[in-house]
Amino acid sequence: MLAPRPLDLRAPRDINLWRTPLALSLGAIVLFGVTMIPDVLDKYAIIHIPSWLTMGSIDDARAILSATMGAVATVLALIFSVALLVLSMVATLFGPRLLYRFMQDRVTQRTVGLFMGTFIYIGLCFLVTHEDPESRFVPQISLITSWILVIASFASLVYYSHRIATSIQNPDMIARIARDIYPAVVRSHARTSVEGEGALPDDAAVLARAATGAIVACPTSGYLQHFDHAALVAAARDQSAMIVLRFRPGQFVLRGEPLASIVPASAASVLEKQVDRCVAFGDHRTLVQDSEFGIAQIVEIAIRALSPAVNDTFTGVACVDWLADALLALAENPPLEGNWYDASGVLRVWTPAVRLERLVKLAFDQIRQASTTTPAVLIRQLDAIRRLSARMSPAARMALRDQAEAIRECAAAGAVALDRRDLDAAFERARAELDALAAAA
């Protein structure tokens, strides 16, 4: 039986800035070949192009094409300059790890590609426009098409300018990252990826059973970006085995480290190759199945904003707001356990669980530590704790309580009396909500 083909779980982003422009440039060459067909047929009087579709004499056509090529080339250089300037600003304001969000932007790629394709198309039109008496030729349909491409290119330039102006704003960037976190969880834990469901296993029992299995060593060093759990479940089911992955997406794995255990060991000869096929590594983390990475990105923006060199309290507050939204999305998506079952409810694939309390700690710790002299951010964190507590699990509420206590200690250490009163009031509101929920449980 053929091994199941892994799903395409590549990161939903293309950080190759050249791929789309290259495709559109090749498309422009193909389009030129298509539009030349009626022009050649008209030249040999096989068909007749109406006079209202013509664009004047050969001299007029060459002059128009030459001027248009120069304008398109100038704008293309301007687009590249703006793109490089934006990348420089992003690296400074948000951090170099967020550069890929601008490199992946489809609007930038398509705008560059459209201008490159238009430039190539006009250049080809210019080459075939002959003024020799023996080979006079004006590709009228191609000339009209070139003008359509020019209009489309400049329309895309207007939208590109709008896109750049909005995308470099802090609130827009933070909101987009937060909204990407929930799809990452869905891709990682969606029950549509498995065929059945069983009772949650005891992690210690699973690891004890894995100790009796065969070890699959990691073939390369790098971040575990994603794995195809559906294909692994199918392969393990066919061999009546279980695959225990020792790492979850987002963790760094060293070459030669135990990546997975296969139980029973007799199935290792078949399943080892399947594990290699279905687990992807890379030089960086992605949001494909790594919800922690999205939270870490927002935290990085907040820490940069709260640094003494920037001191942007409003961005720090916005980061706290959107982190609360991200935690809410994670809390409302229950299957955070890394367990995948076959149709009979037999556990086939296990990975370390993503605990919500760990995500709470990740979302609050570093921002709290960077906000010891920024009471507004600490107050907003306490407000977020109060609003989240009713919708969190008991374990996550304990983590929220720990965060509230830590924030109060920060306030006692560094805030002035007036700010300390505001912080104490926010803390009491959060504690009252947590106490009420604990009493009702």
Language-model regions, residue ranges each:
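Polybasic, low-complexity association/targeting segments
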Residues: 1-41
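Short basic (Lys/Arg) and small-residue
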Residues: 1-12, 159-244, 248-249, 257-265, ...
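Transmembrane alpha-helix detector for multi-pass membrane proteins
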Residues: 24, 28-43, 56-131, 154-161, ...
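Alpha-helical transmembrane segments and adjacent TM-loop junctions that form the membrane-embedded core
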Residues: 148-154
